Amino acid sequence: IIWKAEDDWKSGQGKLSMKDKLNFSSINVLVVGDLMLDKNVLGYSNRLSPEAPVPVFIPDGQKNFLGGAGNVVRNLFDLGANVKCVGIVGDDNGGDEIIKISNTLNANILKNIVIAQEHQTTIKERIYLGKKQILRIDHEENINSKYDQIILEKCDQLIASSDILILSDYDKGVLSSNVLHSLVQKAKELNIPTIVDPKKTDFSHYSGSNIITPNLYEFKKA
């Protein structure tokens, strides 16, 4: 990451944006983790239901975004990093949408994902009544450990050419204990720093990583 103090001076006393200050263009990042689709359903209500004292929701729009490890990928791409991702999606509409959105960024980003025939893609569906979120529907199932070896084989092809390894764990099964241990050890052998966004409450699963970034809730539960 390149950020020289004189850059601020030359550009007019600190008027560079954070994106300009953080130059990721020469950084190769491997992101491994749980891919999700964030689905925001927008709508309104103009009456109550006769069946129960609840509003009748009328959808009038939908916005889809990369979620989970995909959100990390999107942020890194926006910063200019050369990013590759290893994860799992289902052979379904949710998986197709994740691939479609990723391809609008760069067709190579999800070149190494696994499409699991029997797996349901994780979808976080948020219902917005006007600007207020009133409900979240989670469509998900944990990934079988039989995919551990496939994930590790995909990572073996990419990790040696990476400058940073990011493990985005939402505890959906991609980053099993076996995968975590193997990837952290491999990164240490190659002297590649590992950053973990944790979900498991037992942080010993991430032993050997360089940086762990829990939010306050995750930190209190650990």
Identify what each model region corresponds to:
Residues P53-D60:
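Divalent-cation-assisted or electrostatically stabilized phosphate/pyrophosphate-binding catalytic cores
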Residues R47-E51:
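Extended active-site and interfacial segments that coordinate phosphate-rich ligands
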Residues G14-N46, G61-A222:
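Ribokinase/PfkB-type carbohydrate-kinase core domain
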Residues I1-I2, M18:
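Accessible peptide chain termini
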